Amino acid sequence: MPLRDSLSNTWSHIQGFLFPMLRDEVGPLTDKQKQVVVVLEVAGIAAFVHMWPGLPGRPPADRHAIARAFVAKAVLALPQTNMLIERLIADKTLRRLCGWEHPGQVPSEATFSRAFAEFAEGGLPARVHEALIKETHAERLVGHISRDATAIEAREAPVKAAKPQAPKRRRGRPRKGEVVEKKEPRRLERQVGQTLPEMLADLPKHCAVGTKRNAKGHTESWIGYKLHIDTADGDIPVSCLLTSASLHDSQAAIPLAAMTASRVTNLYDLMDSAYDAPEIKANSEALGHVSIIDVNPRRGGKVAHEDEARAKRAANYRLAEDLRYNQRSAAERSIAA
């Protein structure tokens, strides 16, 4: 079913049936509570959470209810688990939407933390997102995929990763019979022959210090992580990848492209100058896409590149690729949302 028809049918069901039924069952809903209901209905998160009843020992807390509370925590922008618990105890309607009738049934903070850790370890949000994208884009041809990354700040100490020290060698030509170790290939070179799981395992995921130049040309630093996003036309994020903040944007481009190619069919890959690398261009072409990447002038070529761009603007000369590149603003809107 086309994406527009699928969303239209889902919204008609929510507006015409689900909201009236819930209004009779739990009472009037606020706008935020309606947002929680919509996300729960569209994502169908309970289908991705497994329960194992009948096992010996104390029965575990209802993971379906905790998963719904996990969604409510994100929709209501509650940064801490104790804030979610306080909200569930005070808000009867929200509590019943999640699946608990009485305040005493709301689990403790430790139980929530263990369950959330299970969800993160099992990749619950990523699996729900992947299934939703595949379902809604199965019969859709995406024109442009805009690739970008954004900072994710974290309240934890950065981990200093130990860099392997290369063995020192005397300067000059090697002696006769001396074996010179070859340089280890760069990550982009390694990724060309790796599978997606191998590429993902090779990316650093610890908390680190990141530095990025913003749209105004100023350098910003933060402690935490970096979220790499592929955004389709319509500002729809189709693939996301979380890495250390210190990882350069280009290092996540090839695995992110592999994830996106398994979910949607697209024509153009739009990237800024941080992704200007021959391996990324070749990978895009191998997937059957046209890559439009802003030029990264290296080795003193910046002045010549700016002069050429200025001359084109003066002559009102614009290529079709330049017009398509403007679609990359979808990535910025997706990140801002």
Predicted regions and their residues:
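Short, positively charged, Gly/Tyr-enriched micro-motifs
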Residues: 59-127
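Catalytic-loop motifs flanking and including active-site residues across diverse enzymes
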Residues: 65-68, 252, 330-334
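Polybasic low-complexity intrinsically disordered regions
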Residues: 86, 109-286
